[in-house]
């Protein structure tokens, strides 16, 4: 009978676990641990719910007697909130010891990932969005909430379940098969609280601590864009290399301390020293100070005890009617601001030896054993990102893609005037430790197969190893790289150079994450941004289904029309329509074409029609790969001649989809890349599109393959690849104007030398003409680019929430075609294409000849110098000119026509080089500033000449006009 007592207690305390459904995977991973009796320390709590009075009750959430088998094990267990009506958590009491537990996290959600008594957290924490309510580590004392403040749970809007995550770092305490029932006790009340508590997490995800480095700083900063919050407690968290963590509110340049603490002290939630309120427009800033002394290899951010973390938890309350339960900051939007951070943030806090409570598994011996695992090649985010998930703070990092995570490394030992130059842009890579594969893909930044299941699952942050590949600090300025590093970068051809327009105030607009930029028919800049929404690791689950629907659509205008001269907002729209904006294009009629990666849809919007979208492609919130669905589509291009719609689809699919002007599916092409050398037509995140109507080509920024691929719009045949080592591993966006192709790359990977920057290329041969960077701020994740035909370029950055304007040092129309890097041959080819199209469809032999002229462009190892090419081109012209003048002089003497002006072929030759010859090199048409469509090939079908070419009727139509492509047969659909 006595032997049955433990079994009866199990049934009484955890009756639901006996009836719960268990997946085969979860049963396999539990090693029969649930069949063992609880240890004596687990028998103290036989009633998980204990009434306190008529309105209050206590809830005991404990692990059900678990025995971890290996270090860095993460176990999760769930408990349903015992009341259906709304309740409020007003107190927490930890039930754990540092002897067995590294740290604990308590989440609130509506559906846990498992219904078993407990499970490995790599199976997921919650299937929906999870909000962190409490975090504990290092024998921290209880957290006390102010009177009238509570975490809202239950009811229609609150969480239905608590999910406890426990990280067991060292398992030496379990060598004798001891069991653990660590957890947390909650005090809840049914009485409504006027103030609702929440958590603001500031977290670095890609800091690298070099071995032997005495001081390494990791900085985090974000703009606060919400209703006022009142900070009442904070908690810092690093592993054993952390010396001090400081958090501040920055308002009008003034730094106000939120909290500063040594992470080697008990990691409790400490009360703030004085009341701190944070209002809309303030900046929140945090700095973690690390040391790499004593290490023989670099230390990265990650989930194991041998890795590091840089987290600042800010506990706050807000008025109930405006309350937001969880907010995050994983960026550094104002790195230069840290030059004025109070000196105290750089001073470690002394800790007495008896106060330092470290696990034995923090010893260097075990650290060295684990390092090789962290040095395996990893893939980049993305947010991903890629990125990182805020939950990694606590446990493990998630990979993030496109527009989400970055950290700047700051060295305070350098002189103040050079501090801003030491800001490092770090590309982080997050990948599951046992995947054993390397794959570049961002934001967030998706991995395919098992990697996708790990990274995009917002709560699948356990048993992941976050390995970072940061670049070394480099100077972000307009200068050439040191000798040997920049052999790929050509000298500026002549005086052709892009420079930031330093007098343009648009750089200070500070919208949300800038995902798209375009130019409308009036040459106004149009910005597509995400407002207060961000794409991070908890945005999507493993099936790419958006997880933050409860936040609702973005409540501010997401489309801004900006005056290109003074950056004034002329018009705004897009409120309550989008969740995660991405691509923006504008067609020849001024319609906006946008994509939303959360909705998995493409929208056509008439800026003058306030009644809603004109056309919608895809199914709302339904990812897919058939003719009626998209999966995180990235960009749209519309052919100005045929009206054909091209969609790059996208992060989950690897294809280009074509639709008719009415939205009927026509065809698709492309497939996922395989291997390290992707073939033509293979993509890894087709991220940006640029149409070249004149040549009938569609170019694609194959982002994670670091290249540009061009295809024929009529046959979908691969034409060529543009790839340079200076691109690095990513090409984020491209934009085309006649003769030129513009592009921006992404953050460098660890060990790479290529910085993030903009490129100008000769479209005819793909050679780089110019490389440029901003002066004010710096590129972090330049997400989109658009160029106008006068050479003005705008670039939007998804991390710094910034838009830059760049202009040419001189007007192109006053520059020789050689100086601009555009060859006469390209113009002649374009003229031939246009003339042929206007007369008849090209024959197959003609198409073959045209294809032969456009060879596959790889970066040349050695090429003919530009000066030599220019000389070879100029010599025949000079000789022809001399012969013509001599003949004319002889004729003048023979016939006495000394007053006759030169009207011969020599004049026509000169006319061609001045852009005045009919059908010649019309630079005025190529580069004159006029109202047109310059976003990604939306070129105006104009028959007007510029002011300097009015006498040359038809010259512009010959160069700009592209006859509509023949309609595809209905069978192709």
From Swiss-Prot:
One BP term from GO: response to zinc ion
Positions bound to Cu(2+) 1: 102-103, 167
Gene name per UniProt: PAM
NHL repeats: 498-541, 567-608, 617-662, 670-714, 766-809
Disulfide pairings: 42-181, 76-121, 109-126, 222-329, 288-310, 631-652, 699-710
Residues bearing PTM Phosphoserine: 918, 929, 942, 946, 957
Entry's transmembrane regions: 864-887
Organism encoding this protein: Homo sapiens (Human)
Protein residues bound to Ca(2+): 517, 584, 784
Activation/inhibition comment: PAM activity is inhibited by EDTA, phenylglyoxal and diethyl pyrocarbonate. PAL activity is stimulated by cadmium and inhibited by mercury.
Binding-site list for Zn(2+): 582, 687, 783
Protein name: Peptidyl-glycine alpha-amidating monooxygenase
Region (Peptidyl-alpha-hydroxyglycine alpha-amidating lyase): 495-817
SUPFAM superfamilies: NHL repeat, PHM/PNGase F
Cell compartments where the protein resides: Cytoplasmic vesicle, Secretory vesicle membrane
Biased composition (Acidic residues): 949-961
Coiled-coil residues: none
């Amino acid at each position: 009978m006595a032997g049955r007592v433990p079994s009866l207690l199990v049934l009484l305390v955890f009756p639901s676990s006996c009836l719960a459904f268990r997946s085969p995977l979860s049963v396999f991973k539990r090693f029969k641990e649930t069949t063992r009796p609880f240890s004596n320390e687990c028998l103290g709590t036989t009633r998980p719910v204990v009434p306190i009075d008529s309105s209050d009750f206590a809830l005991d959430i404990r692990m059900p007697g678990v025995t971890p088998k290996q270090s860095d094990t993460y176990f999760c267990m769930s408990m349903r909130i015992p009341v259906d009506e709304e309740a409020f958590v007003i107190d927490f009491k930890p039930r754990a010891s540092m002897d067995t537990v590294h740290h604990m996290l308590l989440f609130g959600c509506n559906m846990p990932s498992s219904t078993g008594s407990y499970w490995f957290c790599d199976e997921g924490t919650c299937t929906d969005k999870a909000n962190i309510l409490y975090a504990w580590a290092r024998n921290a004392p209880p957290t006390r909430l102010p009177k009238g403040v509570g975490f809202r749970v239950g009811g229609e809007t609150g969480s239905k379940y608590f999910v406890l995550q426990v990280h067991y770092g060292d398992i030496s305490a379990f060598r004798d098969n001891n069991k653990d029932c660590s957890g947390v006790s909650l005090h809840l009340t049914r009485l409504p609280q006027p103030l609702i508590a929440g958590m603001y997490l500031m977290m670095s995800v890609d800091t690298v601590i070099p071995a032997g480095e005495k001081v390494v700083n990791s900085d985090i900063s974000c703009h606060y864009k919400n209703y006022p919050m009142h900070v009442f407690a904070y908690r810092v968290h690093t592993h054993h290399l952390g010396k001090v963590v400081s958090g501040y509110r920055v308002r009008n340049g003034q730094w106000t301390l939120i909290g500063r603490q040594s992470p080697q002290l008990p990691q409790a939630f400490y009360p703030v020293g004085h009341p701190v309120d944070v209002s809309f427009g303030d900046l929140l800033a945090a700095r973690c100070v690390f040391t790499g002394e004593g290490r023989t290899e670099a230390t990265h951010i990650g989930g194991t005890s041998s890795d590091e973390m840089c987290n600042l938890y800010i506990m706050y309350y807000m008025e109930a009617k405006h309350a937001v339960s969880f907010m995050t900051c994983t960026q550094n939007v104002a790195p230069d601001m840290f030059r004025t951070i109070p000196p105290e943030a750089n001073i470690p806090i002394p800790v007495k030896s008896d106060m330092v409570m470290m696990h034995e598994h923090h010893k260097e011996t075990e650290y060295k054993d684990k390092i090789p695992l962290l040095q395996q090649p990893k893939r980049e985010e993305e947010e991903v990102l890629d990125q990182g998930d805020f939950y990694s703070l606590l446990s493990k990092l998630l990979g993030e893609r496109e527009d989400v995570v970055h950290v700047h490394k700051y060295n305070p030992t350098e002189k103040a005037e050079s501090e801003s130059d030491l800001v490092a842009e770090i590309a982080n890579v997050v990948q599951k430790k046992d995947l054993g594969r390397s794959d570049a893909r961002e934001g967030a930044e998706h991995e395919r197969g098992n990697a996708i299941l790990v990274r995009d699952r917002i709560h699948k942050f356990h048993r992941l190893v976050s390995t970072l590949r940061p670049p070394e600090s480099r100077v972000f300025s307009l200068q050439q790289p040191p000798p040997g590093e920049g052999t790929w970068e050509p000298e500026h051809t002549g005086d052709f150079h892009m420079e930031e327009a330093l007098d343009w105030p648009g750089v200070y607009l500070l919208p949300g994450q800038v995902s798209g930029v375009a130019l409308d028919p009036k040459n106004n800049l149009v910005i597509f941004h995400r407002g207060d929404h961000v794409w991070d690791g908890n945005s999507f689950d493993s099936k790419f289904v958006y997880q933050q629907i409860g936040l609702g659509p973005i409540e501010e205008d997401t489309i801004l029309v900006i005056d290109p001269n003074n950056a004034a907002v002329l018009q705004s729209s897009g409120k309550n329509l989008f969740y995660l904006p991405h691509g923006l294009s504008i067609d020849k009629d001024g319609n906006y074409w946008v994509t939303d990666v959360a909705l998995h849809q493409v929208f056509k919007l008439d800026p003058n029609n306030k009644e809603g979208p004109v056309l919608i492609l895809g199914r709302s919130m339904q990812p897919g790969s058939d003719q009626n669905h998209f999966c995180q589509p990235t960009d749209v291009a519309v052919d100005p001649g045929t009206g054909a719609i091209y969609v790059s689809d996208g992060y989950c699919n690897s294809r280009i989809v074509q639709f008719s002007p009415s939205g009927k599916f026509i065809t698709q092409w492309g497939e996922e890349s395989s291997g390290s050398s992707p073939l033509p037509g293979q993509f890894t995140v087709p991220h940006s599109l640029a149409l070249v109507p004149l040549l009938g080509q569609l170019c694609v920024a194959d982002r994670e393959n670091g290249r540009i691929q061009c295809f024929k719009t009529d046959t979908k045949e691969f034409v060529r690849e543009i790839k340079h080592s200076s691109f690095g591993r990513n090409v984020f966006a491209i934009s085309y104007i006649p003769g030129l192709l513009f592009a921006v790359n992404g953050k460098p990977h660890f060990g790479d030398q290529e910085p993030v920057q903009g490129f100008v290329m000769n479209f005819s041969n793909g050679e780089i003409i110019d490389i440029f960077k901003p002066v004010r701020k710096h590129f972090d994740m330049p997400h989109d680019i658009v160029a106008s035909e006068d050479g003005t370029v705008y670039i939007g950055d998804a991390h710094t929430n910034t838009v830059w304007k760049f202009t040419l040092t001189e007007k192109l129309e006053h520059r020789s075609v050689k100086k601009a890097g555009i060859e006469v041959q390209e113009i002649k080819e374009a003229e031939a294409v246009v003339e042929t199209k206007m007369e008849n469809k090209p024959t197959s032999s003609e198409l073959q000849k045209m294809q032969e002229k456009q060879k596959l462009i790889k970066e040349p190892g050695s090429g003919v110098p530009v000066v030599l090419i220019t000389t070879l081109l100029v010599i025949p012209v000079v000789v022809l000119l001399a012969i013509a003048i001599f003949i004319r002089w002889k004729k003048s003497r023979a016939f006495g026509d000394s007053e006759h002006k030169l009207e011969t072929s020599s004049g026509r030759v000169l006319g061609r080089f001045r852009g005045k010859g009919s059908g010649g090199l019309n630079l005025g048409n190529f580069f004159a500033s006029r109202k047109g469509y310059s976003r990604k090939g939306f070129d105006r079908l104009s028959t007007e000449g510029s002011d300097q070419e009015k006498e040359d009727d038809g010259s512009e139509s010959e160069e700009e006009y592209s006859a509509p492509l023949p309609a595809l047969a209905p069978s192709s659909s």
